[in-house]
Each structure stands twice: as structure tokens, then as C-alpha cells.
Amino acid sequence: MPSRVVRSVSVSVALAGVLALVGCTTTAPEPEADATVTTVRPADGTTAVTDADAATRAIETSRSLFESTPLVVVSADDDDASFLAAQVAVELGVPLLLDGRGEAVAESASPAPSSTGAPDEPAGGSTAEPEASALDDEIERLGAATVIAVGDVDAESFGDLDVVASDADAEALREATGMDVSDSPDDLTPAAIAALPAPERSTSTPSASAAPIHPMPEPAAPLEGTIALSTDAAGDAAALATARAAGVPATVLPAGAADPLGSTAAIGALHDAGAASTLLLGEAFGTLPDPDWAVRTAATGFELPGGGQHLFADRLYVALYGAPEVPVLGVLGEQDVPATIERARTTAAEYAGLTDRTVVPTLEIIATVAAGDAGDDGNFSNELATSRLEPYIDAAADAGVYVVIDLQPGRTDFLTQAKLYESLLAKPNVGLALDPEWRLAPDEKHLTQIGSVSAQEINTVSDWLADLVNRESLPPKMFVLHQFRLDMIENRQDVDMSHPELELLIHADGQGGQPDKQATWRALHADAPAGMAWGWKNFYDEDLPMLTPEQTMRDVTPEVDLVTYQ
């Protein structure tokens, strides 16, 4: 049975409709007053539709975008049916809902025993009755009078509604609806659904030979100010189709990488759309720690060299270290700004053929310099004016060079000094480094001992910096902790790694013979916080000998994420 009509219209009415169509012109009929589809733009910001159940996601998407419709499409909760049904829903401009009731009945018939031997209570109300109620409630909320049922859907379950039922077969669905439905594998994908044209008004009329659809919906005008991101998981087809039916543009991401910050396609789509409302459609987006920040940040359009906004995994940073115009503190200060940028790019280029990762030239600029004298503020640290750093940062931004500003605070604390450079840290290409070697106790002076900092103080800085990043819709920042002795960071296991706005890196600063440096490297890795990235420093004068780029990539294991030259 390819198609059938259940409680649609009487035979005489259907025949009258056919006869009327024979004598009419090709002009589309005027829609009935109650046939208009009404959509609504979601609230400003990000709406994440991430429930584990695809049928629930479809309902939530419908609630987010549709106020009323005379007709809905209901598909069996399986891939074949939903991809075919999606084409009909988008052309008609109506929601696509999923009927998961058959699965729920089967699951509820044989409940899994709990550890006590008694049947488990169903999680999240996923029994047959609640699922049926959720679907029925949504159809009632929408005011739909007609259902197009595709696949293994119980047409009798819709009560007094008119039902046009079709097997999950393209030919059957064409016969049932009079619409052009494709069963080409290329058309049965989330990407193909996203590419379907938005519904057009007064054109979606089934042929005279089709099963009756009454009243015929009049699609709403495409929603403006809204964009959707979905995944390529088949279970997201219904939610995605509902978004397209509302005229919402959609971009599809891999389900295994459902992160706007990591996707050039998502960044470009969000930036170009400039939308006030964003829908994230897919269970995979549920892993995002802060979806709203991720969307706001991606929408800025900023990308690191190599694409995306995440710092590590597929990038290697190669940095020059030092202070502006102070050659004794490192190679960064040995030349003017243009020459520094060129030297950074040349140094980084030596690594390009040694790794599959994108190599990013970097500057690590000492912003507060450890001092032998207390100075007017008594903190044994000279704070450089932001105006001395800005030319480097601006030139770096133009050249695709990342920047890290380094703090050597003396007797003050890291947070106090970090706040002095808030205007610089508010730039997307600027990270922050803390150098505990130069963190003094109230009665200490530099070079008489190695300084240290507590995890608690580090966390006060990371809390503040993460808040800045989130508030300003900035991409994740590199947050560097310099260390070459275990006691330089007290209670290192308590360093907060939970901020999605920061990507932390321990920078091994040891100098001297390579056996000693390798021993330090191994010691620092022991019991380090999970998820930490790693940096290695090559000293031109102090290392015996300094590693070549080839040796750095070959001999330093695990492989480094940042190589700094001083």
C-alpha cells in the first residue's frame, strides 16, 4: 500500500476538488484564512536544542520557531523516513516532528531491572504515554488539522485529525503529496536538507492526482535575524528541516566536532549572518561548556592562522621572547617592530616542514620586568606602559602573529599587574603568561632565591581573565605558566583547568645542558593537570648546546605546543 488517506475528506468532496482543478487556471489558489503558517523568531542569544532524544529535539525546535500551522509532517523516527519527510516539510514550510512512540512502547514492555531487581523508573518520562502526549500536545499547540504521516506511524493515533499517510518511499510520498521527493543518496543527508531552498509563498500546491491535503498551508515569510547550526548526525534531520521550513539558514558541522569555535564554516556563517538569534540543533552541542559565549565569539569572525579559534591540538607556536628595546632580556628587543615581526616569521618558518600542524609565529613580550630596585611603588617590578607594547601587538595582528604578554611581578601579585594590561588583553590575538620565578614574598629580592606562586593566586587571575574573555566575546586565550622547578607552583594540582575561555600551557624554562633540561621536562610532566599544553624554551647563549628545530621536534617528547627563543 504505497499511500492512503485516513479521515481526510469524503470521496465526494475529493472528487469535487479534482473536477474543480480541471477547470481552473495555473494560478495558485488563495489560501484559506486559517491556512497561514505563523512563525516566531527565537529569543535573542543562543538557544541550544540538545536533548538526547531526537523526537524531543524536533518538538523543541518547532516550539522555538512556529506559533501555528494548519498542517504538520510526522515521520517515523528512522533515517529513511525522516530524510524523505524533511523534503516535504521544507517545501510546505511546516514543522517536521518525529513519532518515537513505537520505540517507547517496545522499550516499556520489557523494562530493564535495577540493581534491586525491581523495574527501573523510565528516565526523563520516556514511556509510551509521555512521548505520545508530547507529540500530541505539540500538534495541538500548533493548531494543526492535518498530518502528513511518513513511514511506520500509526495514523489512527491522531484522533480526529485528517491524516495523509505514506510509506517511507519516495514514489509513495510523491503520490501522496504531489511533491517532488528525491531518494538519491546525495539528497538524503543533513547537508542536503540545509541546502533546500526556503519555502515559497502560494506555490506549494499538490497536484490534482495527489491525496487531498486540506487546508493547504501558506508558508510564512522566511524568518530574519536567525541562524541555525546543526550536525551531520541523521537524528538531527527533523530539527534541521523544521529550521529550514521556517526559512532559517543553516550550517552543518560534523557531529564529532560540534563546536563553533573550531569550525571555519560556522565562524564564517555566524559572522556573515549577523543574527540576533542562533539555534544549536543536535545532542552533540550539549558538550559545549558555554554555548552562548561560543556563538558570540565565533560571530566575531576572528580566526587564527590555520582556521578556527582554538589554540592547540593542530597548531605549533614558535615565539621570540624579550622586552621592547631591551636586547639583554631577549631576542625580541634586538630590533625594531617591523624587523621583530619578520624575525618571528622567519624563525617559525624553520618548523614548517617538521610538523603537520600549522606553525604560528609568536611574540612573548615582557610587560612587567623584574627590577633590582624597589622603585616608587616598592614592588621591585618595572611596569611598561601599554603604549610601548601596542605597536608590537598591532603589527602582530596585521601579520597573523600571536602575542603573549609576560608578567614578572616582584612583590605585588599577578592579578594586580594583569589588570594594568586589560586593554591589551581585550584583543583577540593576545594571551597572558605568569612567571613565578620573579614573584617575591614581602621580604625577598630578586636573584637571591627562585620565586613561587600558589595555585590559588593563579586561579584568581584565571577567573578574572576568563570573565574578560567571555564578557568581550573573545576567542580562548593562551594562559602560560612558566616553571622549571616543581616548587615554583604550590599545589599545582589545584590549578583550575575548567575555564573554556582559557587554554593553559606550562612553559619549561630550564637552561643549560640538554640532559638536565630533559630531566626537568620529564619531572614537570609528572602529575601535571590533565589537558595542559606544553612549552619548551631554547636559549641561544645558555643552552649547551641549543637544540636545532629538527632536534626540538625529534628529541622533546611529548611533542611541544610552544617553542620560545631567548
Label the predicted regions.
Residues 229-230, 256, 448-565:
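Surface-exposed substrate-engagement region within the catalytic domains
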Residues 1-29:
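Secretory targeting and sorting signals
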Residues 308-313, 342-358, 393-398, 421-429, ...:
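Acidic (Asp/Glu)-rich catalytic clusters
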Residues 290-339:
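N-terminal module-boundary/linker segments of secreted carbohydrate-active enzymes
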Residues 69, 77, 86-87, 320-393:
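N-terminal carbohydrate-binding/catalytic regions of secreted carbohydrate-active enzymes
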Residues 355-402, 411-427, 431-433, 440, ...:
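Chitinase-like catalytic core of GlcNAc-active glycosidases
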Residues 316-322, 361-365, 403-407, 428-435, ...:
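Hydrophobic faces of well-ordered beta-strands that scaffold small-molecule active sites
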Residues 24-304, 558, 564:
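Alpha-helical transmembrane segments and their helix-helix packing motifs
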